[in-house]
C-alpha cells in the first residue's frame, strides 16, 4: 500500500511539473498563447498598467499582477485614433510570435 501511495504521489508531482505548451511566466503572471504548427503566438500581453484615470499622461506604471493563467490569444483594442471604433485608452499591450522550437539562448 505504501509503495502504491508513493508511486501515485510521484506521478502527481511529475504531472504538476510538466509544462503546458504555449504557457509562459511573465512579469505579471502566467500567460497562455495560441500554439500553431510552426509557431506560438501571444496576443494582447499587458506590459504596463492601463493609462487611464489618474495615470493618464503619466509615465507607464508596472503591470498589476494577476492570478491564474491569462489567455493571450486575441489582439487587445487599438490605441485611440481615427474614428475610435475598436479603440481604447487601455492600450499598453504587445504581441509576440515565437518559433515552435524556440531556444533559451539567443539566436543569431
Question: For each predicted feature, which ranges?
Answer:
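Bacterial N-terminal signal peptides
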Residues: 7-15
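Positively charged n-region of N-terminal signal peptides that target proteins for export
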Residues: 1-4
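Non-catalytic accessory segments of hydrolases
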Residues: 18-108
